From Swiss-Prot:
Subunit structure: Homodimer.
The protein's role, per its UniProt record: Binds to DNA and alters its conformation. May be involved in regulation of gene expression, nucleoid organization and DNA protection.
UniProt source species: Stenotrophomonas maltophilia (strain R551-3)
One Pfam family it belongs to: YbaB_DNA_bd
Protein name: Nucleoid-associated protein Smal_0858
Protein keywords: Cytoplasm, DNA-binding
Gene3D superfamilies reported in the protein's UniProt record: Nucleoid-associated protein YbaB-like domain
GO cellular component terms listed in the entry, alphabetical order: bacterial nucleoid; cytosol
Annotated InterPro entries: YbaB-like_sf, YbaB/EbfC
Region (Disordered) residue spans: 81-106
Location(s) in or outside the cell: Cytoplasm, Nucleoid
Similarity comment text for this entry: Belongs to the YbaB/EbfC family.
Length: 106
């Protein structure tokens, strides 16, 4: 019994270290989402902070279209961050025996 608990504690510590490393890696990435065939692009960090927005000048005459494209480009970048985060977090917990139904990140 004690061996199982010690092993579980070691496993938890290793997983915590891996998760922290993955979170640090995620914070450093930048991704760009785009919409309208590249007429609008939004660059976000792993923490989903906006770094850059690029808008094709031809869209200035259609504010409603521009609003939709900015939102779509932001959502595209956000989805890319989510996918990258899921991948890195999955790698961080690879080989760890989690209880049934427990998913990471929490």
């Amino acid at each position: 019994m004690r061996g199982n608990i010690a092993q579980l504690m070691q496993q938890a510590q290793k997983m915590q270290e891996n998760l922290q490393k993955a979170q640090e890696e995620i914070a450093k990435i930048e991704v760009t989402g785009s919409a309208g065939g590249g007429m609008v692009s939004v660059t976000l960090t792993g923490a989903k902070e906006c770094r850059k927005v690029r808008i094709d000048p031809s869209l200035a005459s259609d504010p409603e279209m521009l609003e939709d494209l900015i939102a779509a480009a932001f959502n595209d970048a956000s989805n890319k961050i989510d996918a990258e985060s899921k991948s890195k977090m999955g790698s961080a917990t690879a080989g760890m025996q989690l209880p049934p139904g427990m998913k990471l990140p929490f």
